[in-house]
C-alpha cells in the first residue's frame, strides 16, 4: 500500500515536472518568436530611417547644387555686365582723349597765331615809336620824363596849396580847442615832470680804476662799447667815468654794468659779458614792472603781454625831452576826463590814449618817426584790441582818417599833453632822431646783426653775421652804408663806418 502511494506520488511528480517542462518550452518558443518579430521590426525601422536620411541628404545636396548653380550664373552675369561697362568707359575715355588732343591742337594753333600777331603788333609799335621820335625830335624816354615832370610839378603845387590851407585851419582849430579845454582839464590832473639826458656819470673809488676799465690794449672798454652800444668817455674828470648814449635803455644798461663791475672789482671781457647779461635781465624786469604799474594805476584790464611790455619800454623813451610813458599816462587821464564831458565811453578813450604811442616802444621804430602810429595800430590789432582803439592809435597823427569821436578825443588829449608849456624840448629830439636814423640806415642792409651810433653820431659801429658777410663783403658793405648815409643825411664833418666781424668758437673740457 505504501509502495502504491509512493509510486503514485512519484508518478505525479514526474508528470508535473514534464508538464512544467512542456509549458516552459512553449513559453520559450513564444519568447523566441517575439524576439524574432522585434528584431525584424527593428531592422525594418532602421532601414526606413536610413533610407529617409539618404533621401533627405540627396534632396539637400540637390537644393545646394541648384543654389550654387544659380549663384554661379548670377556672378557670371555680373562679370559680363561689368566687362560691358568697362568697355563702355574705355570707349568714352578714348573719345575724350581724342577730343582733348584735338582741342590741344587747336589751342597750340591759336597760340602760334597770337604770337605771330603779337610780333607784328610789336614791329608796328616800334615803327610808330621811331616815326614819332623822328617827328618830335624826342626819344621815348625823354617824352616820358617830360610828362612825368609836368604831372609831378602840378601835383606838388596842388598838394602844397591844400597842405598849407589844412595846416592853417588845423592850427587855428587846435589853438582854440587847447585854450578852451586846457583851463577845465589841466587843473584836474597832476603829472610828474622828468627830463631825459643823454649822458650819465659813474663814480669811481679812485683814478686807478680807469686803467682797469680800459684794460690791456683797451680790450675791456672795447668789449663794453661793443656789447652795450654806448660811448664810454674816460677823461681827466677825477674819480668818474662819463657814459654818452642817445638810447636811454643802453645808457641805463651801461651805467648799471659799470657800477657793478667797479663794485665787484673783476673787470675782464668774460666778466663783462656775464654782467651785461645779468643787467639786461634786470632792465627787462623793470620794463615789465613799469608796464604793469601804469596799467594798474589807470585801472585798465585785459591788455596783451606784448602791449604791457611795449608800455614798459616807453619808461626809458623820450620825445622832445618828454618821457613817453608819462606823456601816455597824462594823455590817458586827459582823454578820460574829456570823454566823460562829451558823453563818450571813457574806458575805450583811456585805453586808446594810453596806447597811442605804443609804436615808439618797438625797437625798429625811432622815437618820433611818423610811422610809429601805423606800427602801433598794427601791434594793437594783432593783440586783439577793438577797431575803435586801433583806428584811434593809427589816426592820432592823421596818417589815416579818424573814424570815430573817440579817435578825435585821442588827438585832442595828445595835443594838450604835448603843447603845455615846458612839456617838450626840440634840440634833444633832433639829436636822438639823427642818431637813430644812422642806425636805421645800417639795419636796412642784409647781414647786419647789431648797430650802435656812438661818438655823438660821428661813428657807426656795425656787428655783422660772419656766416653771411665775409671779409670781402665787409669792405663793400662799409662802402655801401657810407654812400647811403651821404645820400640820405645832412651833417657837418664826416661819419666813420666801422664793420665788426667776429668768429667765436666755444668748447668745453670735461
Curated annotation (Swiss-Prot):
GO biological process terms, alphabetically, are:
mRNA catabolic process
Which HAMAP family has this protein been placed in?
RNase_Y
Could you say which protein family the record assigns here? Belongs to the RNase Y family.
What is the role of this chain?
Endoribonuclease that initiates mRNA decay.
- Gene that specifies this protein: rny
Q: Do you know which PANTHER family this protein is assigned to?
A: RIBONUCLEASE Y
Name of the protein in its database record: Ribonuclease Y
Q: Where is the KH domain?
A: 198-258
InterPro entries documented for this protein: HD/PDEase_dom, HD_domain, HDIG_dom, KH_dom, KH_dom_type_1, KH_dom_type_1_sf, Ribonuclease_Y, RNase_Y_N
Q: Which residues form the HD domain?
A: 324-419
- Pfam families for the chain: HD (PF01966), KH_1 (PF00013), RNase_Y_N (PF12072)
Q: What is a single cellular component term in the Gene Ontology annotation?
A: plasma membrane
> What GO molecular function annotation could you give as one example from this UniProt entry?
RNA endonuclease activity
Tell me the enzyme class: hydrolase
Query: Would you say which domain of life the source belongs to?
Result: Bacteria
- EC nos: 3.1.-.-
The record gives the membrane topology as: Single-pass membrane protein
What does the UniProt entry say about where the protein is found? Cell membrane
Q: Which segments cross the bilayer?
A: 2-22
Q: Which UniProt keywords apply?
A: Cell membrane, Endonuclease, Hydrolase, Membrane, Nuclease, RNA-binding, Transmembrane, Transmembrane helix
Q: What is its main location?
A: membrane
Amino acid at each position: 500500500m505504501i509502495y502504491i502511494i509512493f509510486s503514485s506520488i512519484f508518478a505525479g511528480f514526474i508528470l508535473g515536472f514534464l508538464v512544467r517542462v512542456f509549458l516552459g518550452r512553449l513559453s520559450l518558443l513564444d519568447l523566441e518568436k517575439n524576439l524574432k518579430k522585434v528584431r525584424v521590426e527593428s531592422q525594418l525601422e532602421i532601414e526606413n530611417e536610413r533610407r529617409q536620411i539618404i533621401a533627405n541628404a540627396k534632396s539637400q545636396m540637390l537644393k545646394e547644387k541648384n543654389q550654387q548653380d544659380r549663384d554661379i550664373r548670377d556672378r557670371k552675369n555680373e562679370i559680363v555686365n561689368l566687362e560691358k561697362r568697362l568697355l563702355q568707359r574705355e570707349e568714352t575715355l578714348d573719345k575724350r582723349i581724342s577730343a582733348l588732343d584735338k582741342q590741344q591742337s587747336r589751342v597750340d594753333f591759336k597760340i602760334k597765331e597770337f604770337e605771330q600777331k603779337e610780333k607784328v603788333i610789336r614791329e608796328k609799335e616800334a615803327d610808330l615809336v621811331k616815326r614819332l621820335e623822328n617827328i618830335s625830335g624826342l626819344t621815348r624816354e625823354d617824352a616820358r620824363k617830360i610828362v612825368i615832370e609836368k604831372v609831378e610839378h602840378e601835383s606838388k603845387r596842388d598838394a602844397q596849396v591844400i597842405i598849407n590851407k589844412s595846416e592853417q585851419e588845423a592850427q587855428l582849430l587846435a589853438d582854440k580847442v587847447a585854450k578852451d579845454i586846457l583851463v577845465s582839464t589841466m587843473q584836474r590832473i597832476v603829472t610828474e615832470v622828468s627830463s631825459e639826458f643823454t649822458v650819465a656819470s659813474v663814480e669811481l673809488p679812485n683814478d686807478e680804476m680807469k686803467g682797469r676799465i680800459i684794460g690791456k690794449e683797451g680790450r675791456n672798454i672795447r668789449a663794453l662799447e661793443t656789447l652795450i652800444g654806448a660811448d664810454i668817455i674816460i677823461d681827466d674828470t677825477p674819480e668818474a667815468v662819463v657814459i654818452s648814449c642817445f638810447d636811454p635803455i643802453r645808457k641805463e644798461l651801461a651805467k648799471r654794468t659799470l657800477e657793478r663791475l667797479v663794485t665787484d672789482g673783476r673787470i675782464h671781457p668774460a666778466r663783462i659779458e656775464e654782467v651785461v647779461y645779468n643787467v639786461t635781465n634786470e632792465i627787462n624786469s623793470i620794463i615789465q614792472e613799469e608796464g604793469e604799474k601804469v596799467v594798474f594805476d589807470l585801472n585798465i584790464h585785459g591788455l596783451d603781454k606784448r602791449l604791457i611790455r611795449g608800455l614798459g619800454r616807453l619808461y626809458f623813451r623820450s620825445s622832445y625831452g618828454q618821457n613817453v610813458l608819462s606823456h601816455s599816462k597824462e594823455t590817458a587821464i586827459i582823454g578820460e576826463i574829456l570823454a566823460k564831458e562829451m558823453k563818450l565811453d571813457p574806458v575805450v578813450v583811456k585805453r586808446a590814449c594810453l596806447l597811442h604811442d605804443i609804436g615808439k616802444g618797438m625797437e625798429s621804430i625811432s622815437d618820433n618817426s611818423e610811422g610809429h602810429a601805423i606800427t602801433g595800430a598794427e601791434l594793437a590789432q594783432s593783440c586783439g584790441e577793438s577797431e575803435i582803439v586801433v583806428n584811434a592809435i593809427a589816426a592820432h597823427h592823421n596818417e589815416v582818417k579818424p573814424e570815430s569821436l573817440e579817435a578825435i578825443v585821442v588827438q585832442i588829449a595828445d595835443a594838450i599833453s604835448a603843447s603845455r608849456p615846458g612839456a617838450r624840448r626840440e634840440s634833444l629830439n633832433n639829436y636822438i632822431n639823427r642818431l637813430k636814423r644812422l642806425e636805421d640806415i645800417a639795419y636796412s642792409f642784409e647781414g647786419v646783426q647789431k648797430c650802435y651810433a656812438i661818438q655823438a653820431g660821428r661813428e657807426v659801429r656795425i656787428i655783422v653775421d660772419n656766416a653771411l658777410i665775409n671779409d670781402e663783403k665787409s669792405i663793400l658793405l662799409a662802402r655801401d652804408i657810407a654812400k647811403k648815409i651821404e645820400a640820405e643825411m645832412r651833417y657837418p664833418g664826416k661819419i666813420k663806418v666801422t664793420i665788426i666781424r667776429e668768429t667765436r668758437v666755444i668748447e668745453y673740457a670735461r
